[in-house]
Amino acid sequence: MPSLVNKFNVEDLSIINGVLETANSIFKRFRFVYKSDELYAQLKYCLEEFQKPMLELFQMLTGMVDKCVNDKAALTQLFNGLRIMSRVFYSLNWQTIPEFFEDNIKQWMAQFQKFLTYTNPLLVDADEEDEAGPIETLQAAIIDNLALYADKYEEEFQPFLPEMTQNIWSILTATGQQAKYDTLSATGMKFLTSIVSKKWHEAMFQQDGILKNICEEIVIPNLTLRESDTDLFEDDPVEYIRRDIEGSDSDTRRRAAVDLVKGMCINFQGGVTDIMKEYIGQMLQQYEADPAANWLAKDASITLVLALAVQGSTKAHGATSTSDLVDVMDFLGTQIIPELGNAGPDDMPLLKATSVKFLSTFRQMLEPAHIQELMPGLVKLLEAESYVLHTYVASCVERLLILREKDDQTQLKCGPDFLSSNGLVEPLLTGLFAILGRPDYPENEYVMRAIMRVTNVAGPHIAPLCEVLLGQCTRILEKVCANPSNPSFNHYLFETIAALVKNIITADPSTASKFEEMLFPPFQSVLQMDVGEFTPYVFQIMAMLLELRPAGTGASDGYKAMFPILLTAGLWEQRGNVPPLARLVHAFLQASGDAVEGADLENLLGVFQKLNASKLNEEHGFDLLCAIFANLTVEKFSPYLGTIFELNMMRISGGKTLKYLKGFITSLSVLIGSHGADVASTAMETVQPGVFMMILDQLWTTHSSEIAQIASESVRKNLGVGTIRLFVDMAPQLLAGDQAQQALFGKIVEASVLFLEGSSVEDTGAADVVAGEEALAVAEAAGTYSAAYSKLHYAGQPPRDYFAGVADAKAQLAQSLSEVSGTTPVGAVLQGTLSEASMGKLGEYIAAAGVQIQ
């Protein structure tokens, strides 16, 4: 740091500016981070070395500006240095106001004041439209500093606030509409927003005419779209959308003007609303007088209503709270709905796009009758040539289809019957796929998401279009395989296929084979081409197809031929493949476990060994183990049991975790529940004599309560049923043994109670409609799709119930215990072992089952 400061003494401005750039890049680290002792120590060092020399340098360069008033080249370098120092000022003051800066605040504010009012025609390029000049960039940096002080250091800044506010106001009213002034204008409006929104400064804006002047001189001019904005709408629609509805417009004039309106409404809502309603009325009158010439006025009026009415919003739900002073539904009925149906889809597309945005923003206020009225017009607008317009329409339709009834969040406002009775399914899908068929921008993620939503919401009503829709999707899949460049688009594509599979096969399981015929060729292409982004999706849908096949039909020949390939080590090396691949193998074992033997079984156990060695993937290893135990005969897997248990015990002895114990005890429960305790105990005794009893005493029963708290309902059932079979099979040995063995019997019974009671952890694979839609909406809003692995919400994995024949596990526990007690009384053992709570629950089971315990 001292070496940097020493270079301030050179006369070469380019060297000084280079040093300042270096310092700026170093000091940026102090912005937007949480304070810590280490951070403050670093900041203290930087301040001690830099703060005084920087003030002196700023003052020196300011003096040089006055001397070089006619030297453009020198002025340009000087202003660049002053701008960089202003950014450094921001960094050094972001965490807290340093003592030196507080002591010298008058000197700093004097310098800033000078440049807020500085003019020099030499630094103004009248022919430049887009790139900001030296004065504008410096002023924007200074205003950022003033906004920081106004926001965080109000008391220290208060003496300078009125004059600074007046200067910034003057800049905003004098600045032209050219793009080169955009950053300066937006920054100035942000400053005003931070001031007007605070109660502390309320008196400044209570003078007659102040609010009206802000609205008239600052808000309205900056809210109205310019030629450059309409050019962007036509020439770079993707960027227009990114700014307008994806939240990247934080530095635009319109966004800053909207935020200024919202800021004024915090303390002056009534007055600002009344003022703005006047302007809205004037703008609408201008439009009605000559729509073709004044459509921008109506566009601005819609944006003003949005600014006034929306008080809270989220990307996933639109407006969540609105102003009582703005009649949104009246404006919707008188201005928005007529506009959407006015003339053809290509007439004034930007105004229509803004109208669709309004509709989408306030979608939570709409009832099914409103949507029924709107849908035909929206379907027509899908034909629009404008990329922005048909994209906004697709997004709006998609959002309307996930609206839920306020009184019953499980019910969609526009569900399957709504789409079917209004004849909307085919027109919507036809219009949406037509957009994707256009040569420009073929991978429109908003359109693909709308297709996904229509497909899912339509439910069984999608059946007549099934083959056509699936054909469209597979053709798109073939195209994107060549260059998977848009993760969101690709995710929605596979979600669409998953929704189609789910809806059709759930209604008619016999259609599973037809889906396999249509999907296997493109899926095989994905696997052969090794499209890493898509293989996890393919495996999920293939697993889903198997899981939805009619019971007892087994896997098709295509799956059987593919099964050995699924066990190839290379596939399991890719992290994103592991969860869906494990699910697919599990589904195959469930459907056709009898077909697995020999080399395939050995390779499968090799996969288990690999997964078991990984903390990240161990749960998938146990899934495979459970599938083997539940679906293969003992004769097939018993030769390998000793090795399997040895691997388990090595992991446990190396440092057991509750998660690993849950998987281990669950797999043992499935083994014992399916084949009996003797199979497990015999194999374990070959590993180490006495280890089975040790596991029962020190792992199974000791940790049963903890395991129950982290297990889902289906897993707890598997644990409970397996543990019931365990105490039944072990009863003769344990009840005939010593006091410790009898107590172990009681602890096993208590473990079964704890498993069946447990806590209500949700099944991760449960196909819950509301949860699935909400999770998908959150993922979309956050943009959290991963190229490595993204779970398909519409391909939800069903809960794993290895004991489907046991309808009531609690009744089974009571009946099993009654049978055991018929041979050997257990009442005294249970009374002496079980906790009061467990005895109470057990009593409830016994009473409900109508049995007796001796």
Map each language-model feature to its residues.
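Karyopherin-beta/Importin-beta family HEAT-repeat alpha-solenoid scaffold
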Residues: 1-854
